[in-house]
Amino acid sequence: MRQTFMANESNIERKWYVIDAEGQTLGRLSSEVAAILRGKNKVTYTPHVDTGDYVIIINASKIEFTGNKEQDKMYYRHSNHPGGLKSISAGELKRTNPERLLETSIKGMLPSTRLGEKQGKKLFVYGGAEHPHAAQQPENYELRG
């Protein structure tokens, strides 16, 4: 009789992937990266175990938007003080801090639990074409779309 495979920390093999964000659409890239971080692209996926891989995203400043989202999409944060609501458009955030734009999008697609926080720490986003993770020997990852 066969038993169902259950992944645990001892039998997970993690890889490092590099994804070039140049010319990619924000949402399509984010959803695919979130699936890699969760481990859903593997046959050993187990919902309650972190089976995901590490992802390095380069050229985050060259991400693209569809439609008028660059002007219309707004990001909000609040300081918890009266009148402390801050807002910034997606285009302005892309110019000032493209790494935060991608991190916000991807981490919003991960679970809001301790496991989701752990999975989110395997994401590394860089605005330029260089990254300091050459020692991990990352593989290039081709997106489906």
Curated annotation (Swiss-Prot):
Gene3D superfamilies reported in the protein's UniProt record: Ribosomal protein L13 (3.90.1180.10)
Gene Ontology terms: cellular component: cytosolic large ribosomal subunit
Single GO BP term: negative regulation of translation
Alphabetized UniProt keyword annotations: Ribonucleoprotein, Ribosomal protein
Domain of life: Bacteria
Pfam families for the chain: Ribosomal_L13
GO MF entries: mRNA binding; structural constituent of ribosome
NCBIfam families: rplM_bact (TIGR01066)
Family named by the database record: Belongs to the universal ribosomal protein uL13 family.
Subunit structure, as described in the record: Part of the 50S ribosomal subunit.
HAMAP family: Ribosomal_uL13
Function, in words: This protein is one of the early assembly proteins of the 50S ribosomal subunit, although it is not seen to bind rRNA by itself. It is important during the early stages of 50S assembly.
Name of this chain's protein: Large ribosomal subunit protein uL13
